[in-house]
Amino acid sequence: MTVRNIASICNMGTNASALEKDIGPEQFPINEHYFGLVNFGNTCYCNSVLQALYFCRPFRENVLAYKAQQKKKENLLTCLADLFHSIATQKKKVGVIPPKKFISRLRKENDLFDNYMQQDAHEFLNYLLNTIADILQEEKKQEKQNGKLKNGNMNEPAENNKPELTWVHEIFQGTLTNETRCLNCETVSSKDEDFLDLSVDVEQNTSITHCLRDFSNTETLCSEQKYYCETCCSKQEAQKRMRVKKLPMILALHLKRFKYMEQLHRYTKLSYRVVFPLELRLFNTSSDAVNLDRMYDLVAVVVHCGSGPNRGHYITIVKSHGFWLLFDDDIVEKIDAQAIEEFYGLTSDISKNSESGYILFYQSRE
C-alpha cells in the first residue's frame, strides 16, 4: 500500500463495492458496517478520532445504549449517538455518511473547532471524552436531584460532592502514582493522578515500550530543584518517578510528535520511527498496582500525515474482526497487517513529510 495521493478523486460507489469484494461475502462480519465520513473542510482530525472510537467496542456499545434511552436535549453526546446509530443501522454494509449534525454541534460548542482550519486530533479526543463525561455526570446529578424532589428529601445532606464515575471513566481512566523519595530520611510520599490518555515523549528508532519506560524513569531533584520534605521540614535532594497504579480497559497513548523549536519560533513534527506492537504489556507499574499484569491488543491508530501540526492530514487504521481497515475520510480500504509498519515513522530527517502513528488505542484482553 502506498500513500494515497489520488484518494480524493476515487469514486465513492466504486470504493465501497471494492471494499466488499476485498473482504469477501463469506468473511464480511455479521451486523458490522464500514462507512467513511464526509470531510466538511479540514475535519479529518475529527473523522479520524470518531472512526477510532467507533471501533473501540466498549465505547461504541455505551454510545449506542445512550441513544436507546429516552429522548434528551441535543448536546454533543446525543449528536455522536445519532451518528453511531446511523452507521450501525445502515442497510448497506459499506458506504459514506456525512457527520454534519455532529460537526455543527462541535463548532457551536467550542470556538477552537469553529473554523475550517486543521486542528489537533489529540486535543479533539481530549475535549470529546471530557465533554461526554461532563454530560453524563450532569445527567446523573439531575436524576438524583429529581429523585430527592419526588421523595421530598431535598433537605437530606449530600453524601459527597465528588462527581460520579461514568462509563467514559470505566473505559479510559487509569491512575498514575507520582512517587517522591527523600534522599535524606528515605521517606516516600506519593500522589495519585487520574488520566484518560497518556502522552509520551518520542525518540528516534525506538518503540512504544521504550517510550513508556522513559516515561517512568527516575529523576533526581537537586540544586534549585530540591524537594521540600515534610518529615525533615526542609528542602532536600530527592528522587521522583511516575508509575502506573491502575491500568484502563482501553489505553489511549498519545505520541508527542509536535515540538516547539525556539530557533524557528514554531512547532515542527518529529517524524521519528517509533514501533508500536500489535500486542502490548505494561511493565512500569507501582508496587501497589491494581491488575499490574495486563495484556493489550492494538485496535486503532490515528495517523498524522504531513510535516507540521497545522497542515497535513489525519487518517485512521482499525482492527475489526481480525482484519485491518484504513479510513481516510470518505475512503475505506482493507489493508494487510504488514502495512501497519508504514505508519511507524521515518528513520531520518525530523521534519520530513511522513505518515506516522499519533494516537494509539490498546484494548485490554480481560
Swiss-Prot record:
PROSITE patterns: USP_1, USP_2, USP_3. GO terms for biological process: adult feeding behavior; behavioral fear response; behavioral response to ethanol; protein deubiquitination; proteolysis; regulation of postsynaptic neurotransmitter receptor internalization; regulation of protein stability; regulation of synaptic transmission, GABAergic. The active site is at residues 44, 313. Pfam families: UCH (PF00443). Broadly expressed. Keywords: Behavior, Cytoplasm, Hydrolase, Metal-binding, Protease, Thiol protease, Ubl conjugation pathway, Zinc. The keyword Metal-binding applies. Activated by interaction with WDR48. It comes from the Eukaryota. CDD domains: Peptidase_C19G. It catalyses: Thiol-dependent hydrolysis of ester, thioester, amide, peptide and isopeptide bonds formed by the C-terminal Gly of ubiquitin (a 76-residue protein attached to proteins as an intracellular targeting signal). One of its GO terms (cellular component) is glutamatergic synapse. It is found in: Cytoplasm. Transmembrane segments: none annotated. Its EC number is 3.4.19.12. Belongs to the peptidase C19 family. USP12/USP46 subfamily. This is Ubiquitin carboxyl-terminal hydrolase 46.
